[in-house]
């Protein structure tokens, strides 16, 4: 037997990986849209068969899919780069170059970098500036308006995720030439002019509805971006330096706040880590989240008040991977675990447990509050 179904309801699938061949693992990954490579699939099988000696639940497989995605783990940046002869050029670009440059500065005004939702530097004796930038390329290639809007929404929440108040947006946008011949566009891709108009509207829609201006950025056009648009969204915020804190401890409570949870954004992190193909829109359209800046404005006001009244011991946003990633990261920061009651999550529609767990519905934040 390769799997069985536990009917609670809803239906929960268990997979007996000891009965799975290598080809079966590939089929499982494709059918569930896990986007895991063979080494990752094999390590999961070995762990559950040899160490835990039990079946793996569908929710656990989807958790690995999100937590081990390129979007969340930065496997390319953290990997070993070799030349044509197999000689190591660099081990972990993120650590060796990106992080090392800031570590080398070793300045006292660096409050936080590469360990929280946004980087923070001191502005003066009382306030600090928080900055976050992030790409939202794949979602924007499928739905330029929604992809760009949720890209801006995501970095605004990252700023809120370090207790800062967002004050300005920035962006870098890269498209193919606007006069690129229509007949030369590869199947499954959209024309640069359509992408350009949708992305610009999406960014303006989200920022304007929250009263946050886009104050700087850049735009470029090159044939190299016909195959994959670049939407590099950023946000800047300000916070009293003394309010930047993380004091969570075991037995604190997790609170999910903001928008209701729906089916939009499911597989978003793993989709962002895969290649764009001819059928990407048909398969992954639901991976693009639905933007709601009015709801995020409510979040902003609530979070700043929670900060000022010192009501929470920790905060993070729900971005790539949804609850699966946010809860895991928060629990990891205190070297602990968490018990999550999925039936308490406020839903927009009926969802399976694994869908609730990895949904990337926007305008949601996770708080940790003292018991």
What do the PLM-derived regions correspond to, one by one?
Residues 313-316, 366:
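Short catalytic-loop micro-motif centered on adjacent basic/acidic residues
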Residues 331-343:
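A short, contiguous, amphipathic alpha-helix enriched in charged residues
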Residues 342-354:
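Short amphipathic beta-strand starts and helix->beta connectors
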Residues 352-363:
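Short, flexible, solvent-exposed loop/turn segments with mixed acidic/basic and small polar residues
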Residues 252, 362-365:
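Short, surface-exposed beta-edge/turn micro-motifs
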Residues 365-371:
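Repeat-solenoid scaffold signature
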Residues 1-277, 281-295, 303-310, 319-323, ...:
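Core nucleic-acid recognition elements
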